[in-house]
Amino acid sequence: MRGRSYTPSPPRGYGRRGRSPSPRGRFGGSRDSDLPTSLLVRNLRHDCRQEDLRRPFEQFGPVKDIYLPRDYYTGDPRGFGFIQFMDPADAAEAKHQMDGYLLLGRELTVVFAEENRKKPTEMRTRDRGGRSNRFQDRRRSPPRYSRSPPPRRGRRSRSRSRGYNSPPAKRHQSRSVSPQDRRYEKERSYSRSPPHNGSRVRSGSPGRVKSHSRSPRRSVSPRKNRSYTPEQARSQSPVPRQSRSPTPVPRGAQNGDRSPSQ
């Protein structure tokens, strides 16, 4: 019993004791590794070299690397650089002391670098992909760009629907009416109006209305109809109507009346 109870207990206790210091050591080591060791130095002259930066910064501790990025296409310096220290404490001290330092006639701005040094290939992909990512972000961001256009489209569609169904479309048609069509509308109104005089009723015959629809220029204006007297209109209009009428009864009656007279 003692052997059974004793044998499992040491591994459990040992395992617990062994697990407890390990996270402490991990957290302690992670704190040292997570602290920044790289500094971003801005406002550098274009002719600044690595030796010009190494001399003033090495007084705070050993410097691991100095990087002055250049444009991938032109090869010109960008006016900033990265300095990486071996110890995070040295980097913090250098940042505090060198911020605002005059180097080659320019006041430096020193801050902690968010990322470590990148290779030229990474800088090239970043330059090329920066523009495309911006457009992708604009396409993906729904609140600014996807929600704003629909109300504008809705307004345009409403305005168009109103334009087709509302009276403004009639106004557009009334503006496009030519003076010849206006004359035709006046003649129509005369033909539809109740007959005040015989001349107006006879002048608005259906045959003439059809001629107006085909060739409005040759149509007779209502002013000329007004100049005719009722006697002239009666003498001219009944003759074609009697000739076109298909009823043969009056002709037989006329022949019968003439036979006894002869």
From Swiss-Prot:
Where are the Phosphoserine residues found in this chain? Answer: 9, 20, 166, 174, 176, 178, 191, 193, 235, 259, 261
Renumbered to this chain, the Low complexity biased-composition regions fall at 234-246
Q: Which residues does the annotated region (Disordered) include?
A: 1-38, 115-262
Task: Report the SMART domains cross-referenced here.
Answer: RRM
Q: Which UniProt keywords apply?
A: mRNA processing, mRNA splicing, Nucleus, Phosphoprotein, RNA-binding, Spliceosome
Q: Which GO terms describe its biological process?
A: mRNA splicing, via spliceosome; RNA splicing
Q: GO CC annotation: what is one?
A: nuclear speck
Official protein name in the record: Serine/arginine-rich SC35-like splicing factor SCL30A
What family does the entry list?
Answer: Belongs to the splicing factor SR family. SCL subfamily.
Q: Which InterPro entries match?
A: Nucleotide-bd_a/b_plait_sf (IPR012677), RBD_domain_sf (IPR035979), RRM_dom (IPR000504), SRSF (IPR050907)
Gene3D superfamilies reported for this sequence? 3.30.70.330
Gene coding for it? SCL30A
Where does this protein have compositionally biased stretches of type Basic residues? Answer: 150-161, 209-226
Q: What does the UniProt entry report for the null mutant? A: No effect on alternative splicing, due to the redundancy with SCL33. Scl33 and scl30a double mutant shows altered splicing.
At the top level of its lineage, which domain of life is listed? Eukaryota
One Pfam family per UniProt? RRM_1
Quaternary arrangement and interactors, per the entry?
Component of the spliceosome. Interacts with SNRNP35, CYP59 and RS2Z33.
Source species taxonomy: Eukaryota, Viridiplantae, Streptophyta, Embryophyta, Tracheophyta
